């Protein structure tokens, strides 16, 4: 499916990109997860899909993990909170039930080339993207060369 936020010089704001990402989830029959009242973890994860131009295929999710680890500013404690969400635990449980842990190992092995390309690209970044971004950052164009962070 064509996603405008994956274009090189996309004119969308981050907020518009996230809306397009949620529409994409609906189009492929998946429900967009919603944050709890006092959390923004899911919103911030969805934003990384838009910022780094990734969809939700298993390979792209594996690549997004690498973008996040090497291309974002974050705190491990905060990221562990994402892994503890019931929806994410259920997703991992379903994946390992269908293919076992071997499926995840094969997936990451298959994606090693992609992961190395991402690591090289993150080394050329002048600023890491803040995983916990301020709300006003969602109004800035994704391709803006000088981001105020």
Question: How would you label these PLM feature ranges?
Answer:
Residues 140-149:
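Single conserved hydrophobic/aromatic residue that forms the stacking wall/gate
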Residues 1-126, 134:
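Core of folded catalytic or high-affinity ligand/protein-binding domains
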